[in-house]
Amino acid sequence: MPVRILKPRTPGTRFFSYPSFEEITTDKPEKSLLVPNKSTGGRNNNGRVTSRHMGGGHKRYYRIIDFKRNKDGIPAKVATIEYDPNRTARIALLSYADGEKRYILAPNGIKVGDLIECGPEADIKVGNALPLKNIPVGIEVHNIEMRPGKGGQMARSAGSYAVLVAKEGDYATLKMPSGELRKVRVECKATVGVIGNLEHENLSLGKAGRSRWLGIRPQTRGMAMNPVDHPMGGGEGKSKSGGGRKHPKSPWGQKSKGLKTRKRKKASSKLIVRRRDSKK
């Protein structure tokens, strides 16, 4: 998927780049797999902001995606490859031999007319989903389950994948996109291949308005606020912690910039062999 760059005829097109969409085969989604998607604006049921910097944006329908890939032994043909406004990856519409239609995350290299299947007996082929115990070591996988039968939860965004580095006993070891080494039960399913839309990370929105179209509101630095609005607000000049306080904090008073926020007693911590690589 090449990235297209416009000539800087206006300030909004000077830094703007967008995908070519050449892999998209239709602009009409499957109606039976669409559900309304009401925007919350970052508010909970009490009307209070629980997720900042959210609101506005274009209306969207949610596409029901098959993350479980549980139609074992039934072959399917790729009918279309479509754009999904709710995620960075493209989606593929599968038409199964029994007549059912389902959306899946479109792997890189998949084409209309390709045959795809899932289950323990499936071939090691891009787009096929099978348990980790049936996948050879060294294969790149995506849409990985954390618990058997729960559906894929890891490596689902554009261009992401994990590498199966080892299998020992009841667990398989995966190198995640973050660099983390993590154990997962060998009964968990994963899909072979890399998620498509690889050039997504090279795109530039070009102007603030395009960010608003996506439902993303502006972010204001805590240092630029007043003390009543943020723990890091106030002070004379650019005081890092605001008004002489010792450590930078989040808007709710939790220490930020260096503090580990993962729960110490989380059960799945024992499955992490090595923490993710630090971003330097």
Curated annotation (Swiss-Prot):
Amino acid composition bias (Gly residues), ranges on this chain: 232-242
Task performed by this protein: One of the primary rRNA binding proteins. Required for association of the 30S and 50S subunits to form the 70S ribosome, for tRNA binding and peptide bond formation. It has been suggested to have peptidyltransferase activity; this is somewhat controversial. Makes several contacts with the 16S rRNA in the 70S ribosome.
Domain of life: Bacteria
Biological processes, Gene Ontology terms: cytoplasmic translation
GO molecular function, one term: transferase activity
Signal peptide: none
Pfam families recorded: Ribosomal_L2, Ribosomal_L2_C
Subunit structure, as described in the record: Part of the 50S ribosomal subunit. Forms a bridge to the 30S subunit in the 70S ribosome.
The keyword Transport is annotated on this UniProt entry: no
Stretch list, region Disordered: 32-54, 221-280
Keyword check for Ribonucleoprotein: yes
Protein name: Large ribosomal subunit protein uL2
GO cellular component, one term: large ribosomal subunit
Keyword entries, A-Z: Ribonucleoprotein, Ribosomal protein, RNA-binding, rRNA-binding
Compositional bias annotation for Polar residues: 37-49
